[in-house]
Amino acid sequence: MSSSGQTQFRYTQTPSKVVHLRNLPWECVEEELIDLCKRFGKIVNTKSNVGANRNQAFVEFADLNQAISMVSYYASSSEPAQIRGKTVYIQYSNRHEIVNNQSPGDVPGNVLLVTFEGVESHEVSIDVIHLVFSAFGFVHKIATFEKAAGFQALVQFTDVETASAARSALDGRSIPRYLLSAHVGSCSLRMSYSAHTDLNIKFQSHRSRDYTNPYLPVNQTAMDGSMQPALGADGKKVESQSNVLLGLIENMQYAVTVDVLHTVFSAYGTVQKIAIFEKNGSTQALIQYSDIPTAAMAKEALEGHCIYDGGYCKLRLSYSRHTDLNVKAFSDKSRDYTLPDLSLLVAQKGPAVSGSAPPAGWQNPQAQSQYSGYGGSPYMYPSSDPNGASPSGQPPYYG
């Protein structure tokens, strides 16, 4: 709409004590709205973060003439209304007062519904969520899932007071950068109260956790059937887990061999088989573990990790449909670590890199993690220790 058209529209509207503001900057807060409007009169109510993009707001003045004064001023001014340097469009609202009816999400409860904005589900682990919210009190349970609104979580506290304190402190804030991987941008938190009062967690997994019951079995199933959001009740397909990971290797500036992959992935458990192949012009690999929990832990830790310093050879991981790989026991592109005679095959095959034999313990996943480089390339380990120490004892590099 042209400037003249907007001016005409303002004057053809029926004046109201409530002013409608559009095109607000991201995360515009009530104080910024009041600061813009207060010189025109007394403000009695506000309602912000409305609209599909949450970039609109309503401001109610005590007197109709005060609202008219504001709309008329900016309709004739050569300087548009601005908040944080962004032009804000102002017009009369169709409503004559702001009624803040409480939606179900506004009724206080002990369970918070948290939306993580700006990230994918694999970029914020359940351990990070627990760390952030446990600062306000004991967290009983957490369930994560994906909806149309994005990656979300239900966080259960002991009581309403604790949940309210967490919401007041964290709503609209961002998770500290040091808790996120280097490639992840800002992660903002949006919160409302959930209608749930006690989450039904059947298994411990990377998608759900019950901190009140340490004896709950570990299972790849994300949630009990009664927790519909965690099972993708909105129809969105939930990724099926597997003991075999499919890895896409991006930005390959250095060679990635079977031994290099074994070094990386064996830090999280015994690797049974590895196969490297080319598909659609990119290098991919299949890594087989003995069970799903080990594969899930490796996937969570290594997704987005760069094998080499400088952001090279970044891993993008998903679960494979395979459960048992059929690979050649020993080749340049595959390895079967379940064979008892593997060391003999290595000896027959001869030197692996730069004229030197592979490290004596390379077929042993635990021994493999004792050397920190491969062929002189700047490989950096991901952290497998909760305190941030790498398997080699050197500071980890998070790519």
From Swiss-Prot:
UniProt GO cellular component terms: cytoplasm; nucleus; P-body
Ranges annotated as biased composition (Low complexity): 365-384
UniProt superkingdom: Eukaryota
GO biological process, one term: regulation of RNA splicing
Function: Plays a role in pre-mRNA splicing. Binds to the polypyrimidine tract of introns. May promote the binding of U2 snRNP to pre-mRNA.
Lineage: Eukaryota, Viridiplantae, Streptophyta, Embryophyta, Tracheophyta
GO molecular function term, any single one: mRNA binding
Modified residues (N-acetylserine): 2
Pfam name, any one: RRM_5
InterPro entries (UniProt xref): Nucleotide-bd_a/b_plait_sf, PTBP1-like_RRM2, PTBPH1/PTBPH2_RRM1, PTBPH1/PTBPH2_RRM2, PTBPH1/PTBPH2_RRM3, RBD_domain_sf, RRM_dom
UniProt cross-references to CDD domains, sorted A to Z: RRM1_PTBPH1_PTBPH2, RRM2_PTBPH1_PTBPH2, RRM3_PTBPH1_PTBPH2
Keywords per UniProt: Acetylation, mRNA processing, mRNA splicing, Nucleus, Repeat, RNA-binding
Protein name: Polypyrimidine tract-binding protein homolog 1
Principal location listed in the UniProt entry: nucleus
Domain (RRM) ranges: 17-95, 109-196, 242-322
Location(s) in or outside the cell: Nucleus
Organism expressing this protein natively: Arabidopsis thaliana (Mouse-ear cress)
Disordered: region residues: 352-399
